[in-house]
Amino acid sequence: MEKLSEKDKELIRGSWESLGKNKVPHGVVMFSRLFELDPELLTLFHYTTNCGSTQDCLSSPEFLEHVTKVMLVIDAAVSHLDDLPSLEDFLLNLGRKHQAVGVNTQSFAEVGESLLYMLQCSLGQAYTAPLRQAWLNLYSIVVAAMSQGWAKNGEDKAD
């Protein structure tokens, strides 16, 4: 598992300090963007079949619970910047779970784009090119581990 530079860690921690205190609204921004990029992803959430609109789904208790879980994964990654390998088993399992429910690995890129969008919207002028790159570096480490778990789960099913 790759490591982040000390500068990347500093930028990520500094930006997450304010965002991490109010996770759900930021997560809703992220998922709103995700569903703009790929509306089909909404169908992977089985509890969204009764929603009249994307916004209705995003405000449902079940979906807000999922948003909270995703934001807690980001929070865990930020909390473990000095020891990302300690999250490897967790991230491998998360990749397996996403493969099992039908998420394809291309969607991971859209989630990354949505994360960056949320950061840009939330941080405003504090969102700089070095900060964007730091988050991209972290996200690529997370996705690499999740993708390994995703692929491993697919291999297990093929056997």
Curated annotation (Swiss-Prot):
It is an enzyme of class 1 (oxidoreductase). Residues 3-151 form the Globin domain. GO terms for molecular function: GDP-dissociation inhibitor activity; heme binding; metal ion binding; nitrite reductase activity; oxygen binding. Keywords: Cytoplasm, Heme, Iron, Metal-binding, Mitochondrion, Oxidoreductase. Its main location: cytoplasm. GO terms for cellular component: cytosol; mitochondrial matrix. It comes from the Eukaryota. Its EC number is 1.7.-.-. Heme b binds at residues 66, 98. Monomer. Homodimers and homotetramers. Mainly monomeric but also detected as part of homodimers and homotetramers. This is Neuroglobin. It comes from Chaenocephalus aceratus (Blackfin icefish). The lineage of its organism: Eukaryota, Metazoa, Chordata, Craniata, Vertebrata.
